A protein has these predicted regions:
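Short secondary-structure boundary/capping segments
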Residues: 12, 27-28, 56, 124-125, ...
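Residue-level marker of positions within ordered structural domains that often coincide
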Residues: 6, 41, 60, 94, ...
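A generic structural signal for alpha->beta connector loops
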Residues: 17-19, 33, 61, 130, ...
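Short low-complexity stretches enriched in small and charged residues
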Residues: 16-22, 41-52, 88-91, 121-125, ...
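Active-site HxH/HxHxD metal-binding segment of metal-dependent hydrolases
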Residues: 1-21
């Protein structure tokens, strides 16, 4: 088994059970038919030197950004994303609507923050016109129930749940 993890965690894993592949920010790797670009996220890690990561996936046909545990985007990540167009954005949406003042806003996105970023992604051509935004990492205390949230949201938003599969 190969474990692909942020490089500061690599020394914490017992290597006799795994092959360790330390991931470095902005250094693309290949796993099977996928190219994956780790990007820095805006979140506090557990280790002093840790850089929490978002991931941009490519396979020659589609690409998507997977970004949980992070809020807004770091400028260095934005500069890289501007060079790409992707088919889907899977994003941390810990905080729902009407929770202004919640302390988690410095490490996790709120739905209003995502709406602002989404407008920019579409306007700048980073998200394709038909691209979905999948909301994940939702705090159950900061959102209505699944059905209520889905009813409130239209394209481009989908609400993830345990076992959710999104076909691009």
């Amino acid at each position: 088994i190969t474990l692909h993890i942020e490089e500061s965690w690599a020394t914490e894993i017992i290597p006799e059970r795994f092959t360790i592949n330390p991931l470095k920010v902005e250094e693309e790797i290949q796993i099977g038919k996928y190219r994956i670009l780790p990007l820095a996220s805006n979140h506090k890690g557990d280790y002093k030197q840790e850089i929490p990561l978002h991931y941009l996936f490519f396979n020659g046909k589609v690409s998507w950004l997977y970004g949980t545990d992070g809020c807004w985007l770091l400028n260095r990540t934005w500069q890289i994303l501007k060079e790409h167009t992707f088919d889907c954005w899977i994003v941390d949406c810990t905080i729902g609507d009407e929770h202004e003042g919640d302390f988690r806003i410095f490490e996790h996105n709120s739905l209003p923050m995502i709406r602002i970023m989404a407008k920019t992604f579409y306007k700048q051509g980073i998200l394709k016109d038909n691209a979905w935004i999948v909301l994940t990492h939702l705090a159950k205390t900061l959102h209505p129930g699944q059905d209520q949230l889905e009813t409130k949201l239209d394209f481009p938003f989908k609400v993830a749940y345990d076992g959710y599969i999104h076909i691009i």
